[in-house]
Each structure stands twice: as C-alpha cells, then as structure tokens.
C-alpha cells in the first residue's frame, strides 16, 4: 500500500514545494514592484486613478494619458498577471509610464480574482473595461481607433481569450483591436489539479472548452507572443502551439524569445529603471511599430 502511495506523495510534495516557491516569487515581486513604482518618473504623462468601468469593487482602472500622443492616439490596455488569484493595477504604474513616454495612452485594469471568481469572470471584466473606454473616449480624451491589448502571464491569457473564447462577450471596439501582445502567457494547458491555478477554473470543465488555442479564428489582428528564455513557470509549448494555430488560420503571428529573463522578471524588465539592460521593452516597441505602421 505504502509503495503504491509513495509516487503520489512525492508528486504532491513537489507540487506543494513548487507552489510555495512561486508564492515566494510573487511576494518578492510585490516588494520589487513597490520599489519600481516609487522610482517611476512622474513626467510626460497624466494619470487618472481608480476610474470605475463597472459597478463592482474590482471594476477599476488607472488611465495614463501621454503628453506627446502619436498619430491616431493609440491606446494600450494592459492586464496584469498573478495566476488569476493575485495582483493589482497599483503595482503597474511603471507600465503606464514606460509606454506613455513613447506616445501611447495606457489603461491598466483590475479584474475579479479567483477563487471567488473563476473563468470567465476576468475575461468578462476585460470586455466590460474595453466597452467603457470605447463609450467614454471623448470624456477622457482618448481614442479607441487603434487598440492594443497587452498582458503578462495570466493577463496574457485574458487578452487572448477576449478574442478567442467559447462564448465571447460583445466588444464594441472589436474591429479596432489592432494587436495583441502576450508576455509569457499560458494559452494551451490542462489546469486540472494544477497546484498554482486550479482554483481559477471549473475543475469539471475540460480545458479544451476554455483555452484560447481552441477558439482561434481568422482575423486581421496582429499577434506577438513573447516568451522568457528562463521561464520555469509557463511552458514554451503554450506560445509555440498558439503561434502555430494562429498561422494555420491565416493570422499574423510573431513568436519572440526575450533572453536573460524569467517569468516574473519579464514584466519588471519593461520599466524605465531596467529597460536599458534587457530587450523586453525594445521587443514590445518593435511589435507596436509593426502593428501600427501604415
């Protein structure tokens, strides 16, 4: 009996240890993001915090308006990661600043978290935020003519699922979504029993009914999938599989590896404090230039 149980116990112990280490990494990132945001420059943009895009407490976004807008005033909507159970927009001021200084308006959104709210709640929240920004663009002096969705980790899954979803929420500016940029995103994996994110999904629902990989359709959106060279959280196959499926459907997709970074550090390396030492922001800018060129 013990011999039969031993492999299971070993797997369970490994899962617990993995979850503990990732939890530690999130806590370290919280401290790091606090420091990044304290050191983030306040020049070159204005910010309106806690804009209510819906009626619930987590229906909030921070809106960064550039002081030197590009042509057509493109809007980046950023969705944070955190295994669908952790994270807050306040930790990502450095994202707003990093791209507002490049001529983009940036909306950084909150969304409802697991385990209280499981898939597709966070996807519906993103769609609601997009519709709010579209309706109120004149009020906030922004434009939804050129929208770029960008997300990290779980947030990358969310932005991809906003388009590729079993029962998509109607997005009013759907035809104005020019590009999707996924940073270290999980797009094609089995979450059943996963030690990190099992509580974010209905365990009785097969992943084939959830993952955006299975709902890709042909469109004119440009897709940019960035993976971290040293990612030990999200498997490379997620981006490789999605890139292949997008191309099979005739879509535009680019798969790029960012060297010398891991899963958590990928997003921090975008900040003005660290972007000179890593190529993450450079590759995102390359994607933006490619997506928005005439």
What does each model-found stretch correspond to?
Residues 90-108:
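Short amphipathic alpha-helix adjacent to the substrate-entry channel of hydrolases
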Residues 240, 249-294:
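C-terminal catalytic histidine-bearing segment of alpha/beta-hydrolase fold enzymes
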